[in-house]
Amino acid sequence: MARVKRGVTSRAKHTKTLKAAKGFYGRRKNTIRAAKAAVDRSKQYAYRDRKVNKRNFRALWIQRINAAVRESGLTYGRFIDGLNKAGIEVDRKVLSDMAIHEPAAFGALVEAAKKALEYLKDAGTTNEFETAVK
């Protein structure tokens, strides 16, 4: 069996690692051993932070919705409850965007949520409200 030299593949792997470490500080961008550890760690952080990013954006959307809804005298939780009871299904990202860019449309949703909360306080069940609204 012929002998296999690994110089070409090793150089390619090293080049790939050093290319990924571009912009790192100090030895981490020059030395294979340090660069490999830094790149591995950076990939772990990137994986973790892709999950954290989703949580952070959801929290931001909720804060924006809460701020916009409080101007109308509701809290975020009551507003979401009212939307659910009114049968309106809009996600938080869209609600946040509407609160910033289309306040009139967002105000209509707030009024629908208030109406649903008031109606259900008087009547009783969600099904009656959905038939009354339609």
UniProtKB/Swiss-Prot annotation:
<dbReference type="GO" id="GO:0003735">
    <property type="term" value="F:structural constituent of ribosome"/>
</dbReference>
<keyword id="KW-0694">RNA-binding</keyword>
<dbReference type="InterPro" id="IPR049946">
    <property type="entry name" value="RIBOSOMAL_L20_CS"/>
</dbReference>
<keyword id="KW-0687">Ribonucleoprotein</keyword>
<dbReference type="InterPro" id="IPR005813">
    <property type="entry name" value="Ribosomal_bL20"/>
</dbReference>
<comment type="similarity">
    <text>Belongs to the bacterial ribosomal protein bL20 family.</text>
</comment>
<comment type="function">
    <text>Binds directly to 23S ribosomal RNA and is necessary for the in vitro assembly process of the 50S ribosomal subunit. It is not involved in the protein synthesizing functions of that subunit.</text>
</comment>
<dbReference type="GO" id="GO:0019843">
    <property type="term" value="F:rRNA binding"/>
</dbReference>
<dbReference type="GO" id="GO:1990904">
    <property type="term" value="C:ribonucleoprotein complex"/>
</dbReference>
<keyword id="KW-0689">Ribosomal protein</keyword>
<dbReference type="GO" id="GO:0006412">
    <property type="term" value="P:translation"/>
</dbReference>
<dbReference type="GO" id="GO:0005840">
    <property type="term" value="C:ribosome"/>
</dbReference>
<protein>
    <recommendedName>
        <fullName>Large ribosomal subunit protein bL20</fullName>
    </recommendedName>
</protein>
<keyword id="KW-0699">rRNA-binding</keyword>
<dbReference type="InterPro" id="IPR035566">
    <property type="entry name" value="Ribosomal_protein_bL20_C"/>
</dbReference>
<dbReference type="GO" id="GO:0000027">
    <property type="term" value="P:ribosomal large subunit assembly"/>
</dbReference>
<dbReference type="Pfam" id="PF00453">
    <property type="entry name" value="Ribosomal_L20"/>
</dbReference>
